Amino acid sequence: MTTHRTAELSRTVTLSGTATLIAAALLTGCGGGSAAPEAPESNANPAASTDPAPPGSPTSVSSVSATDSGEAPSSETTQTTPTRPPDVARVVTAAGVSQYLECSGVGTPTILIVPGLDSSIDDWLPVLPALREQSRTCVYDRPGIGDSPAREGGGRVDSGLHAEELAALLTEAGESGPFLVVGHSYGGLVARAFINDQPSRVAGVVLAEGVTPFDDTNGSDWPEGGTVVDLPLSYQATGDGPALGTTPLVVLRASDPEGDHLGGPRYGQPQQVTAAWIAGQQAALSLSSNSIGVEATSGHVLQQDDPAAVIKSVAVVLAAVRTGTPLTCADDWQAVAATCTEP
């Protein structure tokens, strides 16, 4: 059960079961997809509404400062955010679908979290407070997941459609960006499609164990929220996109991919990651000339098993965006060539 409180955006959660987050196309030995979640009851989220939020006022924030919690080195530059709505915690209808959106905090660029397959906002609870301290942060549930009602009629979907619906959601909610896009697992494909379609709205990227368009050797479908995600079509929606130029990019991956566990070690569902997955992670670094790889000490669900790695990855991208300097490893990371590793 999840309780949303609009004023404080705090969430009380009982986590159970295993979230199926990794795309079947890049895994071996993968079982059937998790059951599609039921659409939430109309009274399940008292804070949710489709009423537009009133405009907010400009806010000044300073760039993040270095702390043990994983924030990037400080900058003297002070950023002023454009006029924005106040904190958001509601269902927004746009592009014919309704999706639950939470946005909180101040600062620019806005951190935009794109969850993995069958994954809800709840899976990001370990990192949300720290990210909101760094900058404005938005996270959402796709149709049929978490607090978002199911898509009418179900049907087949793909990363391109999900990216279009995400862009419409943000526009309808008054979140104009620019965005630091954080794509996890299948969310990496959605993030790439979003970046291709909305390049002017993207300031930085973190691909956290992101599925990449560099391999389509196993064209499987995967259920999510009463729909079927067409993975081959999802690859096509991202594979021919433009490079990121000098846009800061962190490619964050688990430290033990050959023995990775779906959902992280705590969930105990071992899945062997293929060589194509590893190669795709490496190839993703070529998307930007300002990129670094980060190896985390975790399983696939980094935000659950190694929150600090996610927080620090976002922090170094924020610092690069705000100061206009090349990406560097966090202070306590070890640099080996173009890869940063946790101690």
Language-model regions, residue ranges each:
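C-terminal motif of bacterial Sec signal peptides marking the signal peptidase cleavage site
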Residues: L26-G29
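Conserved HGGG/HGGXW glycine-rich cap/lid loop of the alpha/beta-hydrolase fold
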Residues: T93-D147
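Catalytic active-site module of serine/aspartate enzymes centered on a nucleophile-bearing elbow/loop
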Residues: S291, E295-P343
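Conserved loop-alpha-helix segment in the C-terminal half of the alpha/beta-hydrolase fold
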Residues: P265-G293, P343
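Flexible "cap/lid" loop of the alpha/beta hydrolase fold
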Residues: V206-S234
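Conserved hydrolase catalytic core segment
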Residues: G177-F214
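Active-site loop/oxyanion-hole signature of alpha/beta-hydrolase fold enzymes
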Residues: R142-L180
